[in-house]
Amino acid sequence: MSSTSPITLSKDGRLARITLPTVSLMALFFLALPIIIVVPMSFSSSESLRFPPPGFSLRWYQSFFGDSQWVEAGINSIVIGVSSSTIALVLGTLAAYGLVRGTYRGRGFLESNFIAPMVLPPIIVAVALYIFFARLGILGNYVALIAAHAVLSTPYVVLLMMLAIRAFDERIEQVALSLGATHLQMLTRVLLPNLVPNAAAAWLFAFVISFDEVVVTMFVSGTHMTIPKRMFNQLVLQINPTITAIATLLIGFSIVAVALAAWMTRGSNGLSAAKA
């Protein structure tokens, strides 16, 4: 017979209900603290980084959009992000389907290899890609940069699309095949149309990963500039309040993209559940 009294359990329960939310709020505040500081500083009227800001101004946003070098870096980031995330979506979706529906040996090993760039330290991936592209003679051009970003973002696409394909009722695929559809017709007319929301979410995640990448970019980009690379160079050479405006824009973009991806995925999960 347990010696623990109901009164003790009740006290422990109340303590847990108080402690867990408190610790969670403290952790959330700690994680959000950089955002709480950076966002107000981006609207500062000061010539230097000061918190709290002495006055309100949009001068640093005007400085960003009025600087041709920043605009060029932004265009590069968008072009590289769109290209690499599209490549990652195609390769990642094909890989995810093979990993989920395949019946061959060694699937676990292949899955581990696909997600390796996500779990390895970025510096290791950067050095490996640097050596590989140098041997191919394409180091420092757009092809290498897009390929490197695709390598980094493909694991996220693989994981998201694997979840989506597992959630899709395989019996629907079997029915389509039994009614005379070829495997390609089943993929293009049955499976993929139902995975459009998940694919869009995976593409957004891949784009965010590419747009924020700096370590691998520093190794393989050569003279090409992206927003994160130029931010890093500015922080090393000269701290400019324009950085806070760019950081605020990136934070806002990332929050909107992730929220949109989560919303699209939730809607598709509901659709899959309804069909099942």
Language-model features and meaning:
Residues I7-S10, L49, P53, L58, ...:
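Membrane-interfacial helix termini and adjacent extracytoplasmic/periplasmic loops
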Residues S3-G13, V82-F114, I131, E170, ...:
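Transmembrane-helix boundary motif in ABC transporter permease subunits
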Residues T22-I35, A126, A150-V151, V158-E170, ...:
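Transmembrane alpha-helices
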Residues V38-S48, H149, N198-F232, A247:
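Non-cytoplasmic
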Residues M1-I37:
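N-terminal signal-anchor/first transmembrane alpha helix
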Residues S2-T4, L33-S68, V220-G222, A276:
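Short membrane-interfacial helix/loop motifs at transmembrane-helix boundaries
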Residues K11, E47-S84, V236-L237:
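Periplasmic/extracellular loop-to-transmembrane helix junction in inner-membrane transport proteins
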Residues T4, S10-A16, Y61-Q69, F211-W263, ...:
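Interhelical loop and adjacent transmembrane-helix boundary motif
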